[in-house]
Amino acid sequence: MSLPTEVETYVLSIVPSGPLKDEVAQGLEGVFAGKNTDLEVLLEWLKTRPILSPLTKGILGFVFTLTVPGERGLQRRRFVQNALNGNGDPNNMDKAVKLYGKLKREITFHGAKEVALSYSAGALASCMGLIYNRMGTVTTEVAFGLVCATCEQIADSQHRSHRQMVTTTNPLIRHENRMVLVSTTAKAMEQMAGSSEQAAEAMEVASQARQMIQAMRTIGIHPSCGAGLKDDLLENLQAYQKRMGVQMQRFK
């Protein structure tokens, strides 16, 4: 597997499924192919994307800045800096400095990734911040090793959280999680609908989902009735899925 392919794989693992994921994939492919050469345009596009978490935007901004040739001298963007500050935790910064010292001695992607995997995602993000803010320099391969280690830590955490939620035996938690997921998806649909041909339909489906969740929370539906929520909303959400390509399998 080539280095760009490996980096793209790890980065996309932390991007939510849906049309936006395909946009991000195309952006990464263009950058690695040398087609997207205007870093300012790329970063402005990234900044305005809905749904992506600040940390995911920070990681993508870091990758774009590393990859676009001749653009390292440009002014750093605040939204990337803020995302890569380790949540302002001094412990993360202390660990990031120690990690940076180790990474300076590494020369390969896999060596850097192996070293970085022993640190938390917060410390890894802080270390990326050091490099992004020009407070330290490493080779591009080493920086990509750091990126992939960070994405692996985040993806592992998301997987553990999802698995724990799915396997919990508490019906109240499962029921509320189902409603939260539907509500979150409705919000995502509304954010994506703006420029799509199916905007009106997407907004209507999202509105129906929100109204149903609001009603259930207001009157208090017993967890045993949760299956009805799945049946009613999945029918609408899957109709939208077929048109827009948004993956809804997490509701099954």
Swiss-Prot record:
Topology class, membrane: Peripheral membrane protein
Subcellular location(s) of the protein: Virion membrane; Host nucleus
GO cellular component: host cell nucleus; membrane; virion membrane
Superkingdom of origin organism: Viruses
Motif residue range(s): Nuclear localization signal: 101-105
GO biological process, alphabetically ordered: viral budding from plasma membrane
Span list, region RNP-binding: 165-252
Record region (Membrane-binding): 1-164
UniProt entry keywords in alphabetical sequence: Host nucleus, Membrane, RNA-binding, Viral matrix protein, Virion
A molecular function GO annotation: RNA binding
Additional information: Most abundant protein in virion. When expressed alone can form virus-like particles in transfected cells.
HAMAP family according to UniProt: INFV_M1 (MF_04068)
Family: Belongs to the influenza viruses Matrix protein M1 family.
Known role: Plays critical roles in virus replication, from virus entry and uncoating to assembly and budding of the virus particle. M1 binding to ribonucleocapsids (RNPs) in nucleus seems to inhibit viral transcription. Interaction of viral NEP with M1-RNP is thought to promote nuclear export of the complex, which is targeted to the virion assembly site at the apical plasma membrane in polarized epithelial cells. Interactions with NA and HA may bring M1, a non-raft-associated protein, into lipid rafts. Forms a continuous shell on the inner side of the lipid bilayer in virion, where it binds the RNP. Determines the virion's shape: spherical or filamentous. Clinical isolates of influenza are characterized by the presence of significant proportion of filamentous virions, whereas after multiple passage on eggs or cell culture, virions have only spherical morphology. Filamentous virions are thought to be important to infect neighboring cells, and spherical virions more suited to spread through aerosol between hosts organisms.
Subunit structure: Homodimer and homomultimer. Interacts with NEP. Binds ribonucleocapsid by both interacting with genomic RNA and NP protein. May interact with HA and NA. Cannot bind NP without genomic RNA.
Name of the molecule in the record: Matrix protein 1
Protein species of origin: Influenza A virus (strain A/Swine/Iowa/15/1930 H1N1)
Gene expressing this chain: M
